[in-house]
């Protein structure tokens, strides 16, 4: 990562990562498609209404896993093996503890929060059932995410893809068996998801247990090292809060979607799958920006850090734009994978045309935020996200959506918030770069 041509290495890192995310969403889409086609619209809405809430509960800890990626990659750039080992074992133990915490907390808050979100009466029972079963797999989700972050910090984004592929195959087979044959509806989908998460985490942990030093995981060495925990949290908590802020805003948006009825909930859930697919291209190159910047910054290669930003931004915009265009142009065929109900399709098309069409705008803030985290600045991106996305979206819901209670009015807050957040994040990135590189030059020259 710290020597040679960058663009091909970034592609080799980002494409398997994007494939992992797309594959994961594809298998999640199987959940949606199976219940939508072989259960009922209510079952589809029950699965879809949980998406933003699940993200809210896990995003903080996913941010900490990103902190592990940054810290370990930085140590790899510095070639400090003892610190690499300490960070790895701290991260895995944090994953286990946080996974069980979210699992237990979720069992208690599932129904009250779904009711607070205004989940329709004809959906609430199925939605609670799905969420409670899904959360039983949370420790395994955390282990996979943290384990994958460790592997990616070394530049390895392929083996997490293999783990996810194995889990996805299991998930698909179990979905078909439990929903179509045993008629278990949302319970069957949730059980299949839990089992597939066990498979993916098992594969990643097996890889780490058999990895060469200093990346090898030794269960006897699992312990919290305060210094490494502090480093993980310094980067990870702001990153997690950024994701959590998005999720809070999206939970509020989901609550507003719920007010349009189960057809709107189901239609939004169907269209959201394609939104995710396009966004994952952006996220993959943002992850590349984090990892490559962190390693090169640790190695003192500051000019390469600037090149990394430019390359990841270009690739992100191009890949997301192409994928979004394909989905929008073929929207009729794609959306019918999930539902053939005309009332549901009407809402799905609205979301697809407004949000998915402009998904490439997310590159502006995701790549900038990733590059800043790679430089060790994680708090500023979180603050900008809070103001530009969370606060702005909540204001829009409280004002514009109340004045004009139309589905399309709710949807246009997505591109509006992306533009505002993007402008602020790009400005912050250039400020951070100027300040950081100036300090490094003075330090290296002994001033």
Language-model segments: residues:
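Short runs within selected transmembrane alpha-helices of multi-pass transporters and secretion channels
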Residues: 65, 134-152, 160-171, 189-204, ...
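Membrane-helix interface/capping residues of multi-pass secondary transporters
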Residues: 32, 41-44, 81, 110, ...
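Helix-terminus/linker motif at the lipid-water interface of multi-pass membrane proteins
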Residues: 26-45, 114-121, 177-186, 244-277, ...
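Residue-level signal for short hydrophobic patches within transmembrane helices
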Residues: 3, 7-26, 30, 53-60, ...
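Short alpha-helical transmembrane segments in multi-pass integral membrane proteins
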Residues: 1-14, 72-137, 170, 181-237, ...
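Transmembrane helical elements of multi-pass membrane transporters/channels
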Residues: 12-31, 133, 144, 167, ...
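Small-residue-rich hydrophobic transmembrane alpha-helices
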Residues: 44-104, 141-160, 254, 267-325, ...
């Amino acid at each position: 990562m710290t020597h040679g041509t960058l663009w091909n290495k970034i592609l080799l890192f980002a494409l398997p990562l994007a494939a992992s995310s797309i594959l994961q969403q594809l298998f999640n889409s199987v959940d949606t498609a199976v219940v939508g086609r072989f259960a009922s619209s209510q079952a589809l809405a029950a699965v879809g209404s949980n998406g933003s809430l699940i993200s809210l509960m896990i995003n903080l800890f996913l941010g900490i896993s990103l902190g592990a990626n940054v810290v370990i990659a930085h140590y790899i750039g510095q070639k400090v093996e003892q610190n690499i080992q300490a960070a790895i074992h701290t991260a895995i133990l944090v994953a286990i503890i946080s996974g069980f915490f979210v699992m237990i907390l979720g069992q208690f808050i599932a129904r009250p929060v779904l009711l607070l979100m205004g989940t329709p009466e004809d959906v609430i029972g199925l939605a609670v059932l799905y969420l409670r079963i899904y959360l039983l797999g949370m420790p395994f989700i955390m282990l996979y995410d943290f384990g994958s972050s460790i592997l990616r910090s070394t530049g390895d984004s392929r083996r997490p893809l293999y783990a996810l592929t194995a889990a996805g195959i299991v998930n698909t087979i179990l979905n078909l068996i439990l929903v179509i044959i045993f008629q278990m509806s949302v319970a069957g989908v949730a059980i299949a998801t839990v089992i597939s998460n066990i498979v993916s985490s098992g594969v990643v942990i097996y890889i780490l247990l058999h990895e060469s030093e200093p990346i090898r995981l030794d269960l006897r060495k699992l312990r919290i090292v305060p210094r490494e925990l502090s480093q993980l949290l310094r980067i990870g908590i702001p990153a997690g809060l950024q994701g959590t802020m998005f999720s809070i805003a999206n939970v509020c948006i989901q609550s507003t979607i719920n007010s349009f009825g189960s057809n709107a909930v189901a239609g939004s859930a169907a269209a959201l799958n394609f939104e995710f697919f396009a966004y994952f291209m952006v996220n993959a190159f943002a992850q590349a920006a984090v990892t490559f910047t962190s390693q090169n910054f640790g190695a003192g290669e500051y000019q390469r850090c600037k090149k990394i930003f430019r390359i990841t931004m270009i690739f992100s915009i191009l890949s997301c734009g192409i994928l979004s265009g394909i989905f929008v142009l073929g929207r009729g065929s794609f959306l019918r994978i999930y539902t053939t109900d005309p009332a549901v399709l009407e809402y799905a098309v609205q979301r697809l045309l407004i949000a998915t069409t402009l998904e490439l705008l997310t590159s502006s803030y995701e790549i900038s935020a990733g590059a800043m985290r790679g430089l060790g600045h994680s708090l500023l991106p979180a603050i900008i996200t809070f103001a530009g996305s969370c606060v702005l979206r909540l204001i829009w819901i409280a004002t514009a959506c109340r004045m004009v209670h139309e589905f399309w009015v709710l949807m246009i807050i997505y591109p509006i918030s992306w533009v505002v957040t993007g402008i602020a994040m790009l400005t912050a990135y250039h400020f951070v770069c100027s300040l950081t590189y100036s300090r490094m030059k003075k330090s290296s020259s002994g001033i």
